[in-house]
Amino acid sequence: MKVGVPLHELVAYLDEYLRIKQIPDEANAVNGLQVENSGQIGGIVAAVDASQATIDGVIATLEPGEPPPILLVHHGLLWDGNVPLTGRRYRRVAALLDHDIPLYAAHIPLDVHPEVGNNAVLAERLGIRVEGWFGSYRGIAMGVWGHAPASLSTRESIALELDRVLHTLKGSATLIPGGPERPARIGIITGGAGNMIGEARAAGLDTYISGEGPHHTYFDAMEWGINVVYAGHYATETLGVQAMASHLGERFNLEWDFHDHPTGL
């Protein structure tokens, strides 16, 4: 039988490492431990979303008599304040409790972390050395930026490289070619941050990478003279949870796995 790690020890470390209490988020978003268990964990499962498919996937991997893994996600269950545990929410929480699986969520705290954050890790995978931060959200800077490396010498090459590092099909990343053919200063805010194009422009960037954005951002990009690449909300947020799980696995000597449930969005 595996020797489990006390849940409270891992949670205390994560809360401090990710600055859970210090980083602001949406008004009713809950970051940190969302569902507790009986006290021991035997591994780590990372995922983007705490969906029913994700939870069912974790349950399918459980070994009888072994301590369960902790489920680490970017998009947790608790976003909208005090609401009844009914319907879909009840079914997901009940499945976690029935199988003693704890759930830990980190939204904005994971996006902005300088080591395992979605933005920082994507920059690293693209070969971009982070030189600064931009994009104000409730008093903190959301995005990272740096100069384009030689491997990203054209705006088209950025879209192709995003498909490669995010393991998406060629052509998945959408390029809005509003800026220069040869990028110089590239910014990144993963997820659904298309409305931050203005912040990227104000920071003097000529190319902006995000997951997705509303229709009008096409014209924003073309008329403001900035390249925008949308590489998928889900895809751009797969890297942070994996980096976080890898970091925890090494620190606490736990095996970890990533459960991939792409949405195509």
Labelled PLM ranges:
Residues M1-L265:
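Hydrophobic structural segments
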